[in-house]
């Protein structure tokens, strides 16, 4: 059983929802992910998504595009992202780490090489928003060979046939996009989110993690009652980016702690 599956299983036994914050590697400073990741874990993160910057992030809104541009200016590439994972593991970090990025840089690097080096570095899986299942054979085979999870995305507009296809290929969990459109903080979640998650459940028993637009404790509380995981990205990055450098780690920890507390209150978990 993968570390991701073990984490979801443990949380399910406790009646808890997985909290999965996102960091762009190389933002705000080149090495910021090392201290920020530690802070997020201290705040209650169960898994981390580590964003690999790419010059044309099609699925991402203004915040992640901006953080990506800064990371690229800071000289971040695939090799640096893999080294970041290695360094996090060297600190003793044991929670699942997922690399999230676009397919083109991975293809240029070499899919088998990338997956093998990610495994050696200590990664647990991948999220590749622009990799459709019809074109994922090589990546899927490499991930399976190295016992890493490959997570696919579903949107509220996905047909039943698409949901069934993703359910047959995804491992670890299914990334359920909460809203139509690109990433970014929103004021409210979609009214039909529960219906969408119920449709996904008809085709898969994998955990469902909800992302895109999750920006505040109230959102996480709502998701915790419907799904097995909640992903927060843009709102966290905006918050970190507005803090003085010396306050970022503490601020990140407090931000995530507020989400953790909201999720646990929603599910009735008490330590």
Curated annotation (Swiss-Prot):
Swiss-Prot/TrEMBL keywords: Amino-acid biosynthesis, Aromatic amino acid biosynthesis, Lyase, Tryptophan biosynthesis
Function: The alpha subunit is responsible for the aldol cleavage of indoleglycerol phosphate to indole and glyceraldehyde 3-phosphate.
Keyword hit for Amino-acid biosynthesis: yes
Active-site positions on this chain: 49, 60
Listed pathway(s): Amino-acid biosynthesis; L-tryptophan biosynthesis; L-tryptophan from chorismate: step 5/5
Name the record gives this protein: Tryptophan synthase alpha chain
EC number, as in UniProt: 4.2.1.20
MF GO annotations: tryptophan synthase activity
Superkingdom as given in the UniProt entry: Bacteria
Known catalytic reactions: (1S,2R)-1-C-(indol-3-yl)glycerol 3-phosphate + L-serine = D-glyceraldehyde 3-phosphate + L-tryptophan + H2O
Disulfide bonds: none
